[in-house]
């Protein structure tokens, strides 16, 4: 599974998403221009010491990325979409695409891929969720559909006691 951030602006969000990718094995694709330097201390701090676990790819444009992976399915996450992210049957090689924090994905991109746009249901009064939170919500739904393959599902219990949920 792949996470795509189109022109991300806030280094802390990208760092948090990188940490999510490290913990899940998802690949991270960053589409330029980035709103920060990859040497940014907030980016590195948010990703903690997990950067060595993340496969990060940089692309000069979304068109170049899409062309390179044209045989894959792309889902475009937007507050403007009609379909819920829960209505999709994800494949493990799908691309989940998210826009920049201030504006989301460009309207022409959403129009061109209208059939593959998805949204997270939320209150009408709320404009949007934080980018890193939105990525986590959609990513874990996709992983859940595949029984969290290759991920550790069970912990060691709480203080040596068996716990049931």
Question: What do the PLM-derived regions correspond to, one by one?
Answer:
Residues 1-165:
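Post-transcriptional modification and biogenesis factors for structured RNAs
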């Amino acid at each position: 599974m792949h996470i795509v951030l189109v022109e991300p602006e806030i280094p802390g969000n990208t760092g948090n998403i990188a940490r999510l990718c490290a913990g899940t094995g998802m690949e991270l694709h960053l589409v330029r221009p980035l709103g920060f330097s990859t040497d940014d201390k907030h980016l590195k701090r948010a990703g903690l010491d997990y950067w060595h676990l993340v496969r990060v790819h940089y692309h000069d444009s979304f068109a170049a990325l899409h062309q390179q992976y044209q045989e894959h399915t792309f889902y475009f996450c937007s507050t403007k979409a009609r379909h819920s992210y829960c209505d999709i049957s994800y494949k493990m090689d799908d691309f989940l695409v998210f826009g920049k924090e201030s504006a989301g994905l460009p309207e022409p991109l959403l129009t061109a891929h209208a059939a593959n746009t998805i949204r997270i249901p939320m209150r009408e009064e709320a404009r949007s969720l934080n980018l890193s939170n939105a990525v986590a919500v959609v990513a874990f739904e996709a992983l859940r559909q595949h029984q969290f393959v290759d991920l550790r599902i069970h912990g060691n219990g709480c203080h040596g006691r068996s716990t049931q949920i």
